[in-house]
């Protein structure tokens, strides 16, 4: 009889534990969704992701590090006005799923401009075009 009650208690504890973890996971996903849905944060992180890919791919295109740092800090400040702490913003940026999502968006950005995966020269040309146009991406590069 006691063994039966122990089994029931363990099953209840497991159910509550799984429910709590699932709720925490959904809460985290919802938190990230608020950052993803904010146009300033989303477009800013796309600018950084594309600029970073250009910088990493092109010897003749350099990052304007202080400008990029200031731009990134403006995104953190904006997220803080939305109620997020710096630690939460850092957790969002460090999240591997989010990093991959922004890499995928950057790849799509290049594909829309006719750059195929592995086409370093194409990436560099897009970078030079962005610099010439004075776009948000171009302002982070030289």
Can you say where each PLM-predicted feature lies in the sequence?
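Sec/Tat signal peptide C-region and signal peptidase I cleavage site
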Residues: 20-27
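Bacterial N-terminal signal peptides
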Residues: 11-20
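Short N-proximal segments of mature Sec-exported proteins
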Residues: 33-96
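Bacterial N-terminal signal peptides that target proteins for export
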Residues: 2-12
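Compact alpha-helical subdomains of small soluble proteins
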Residues: 70-142
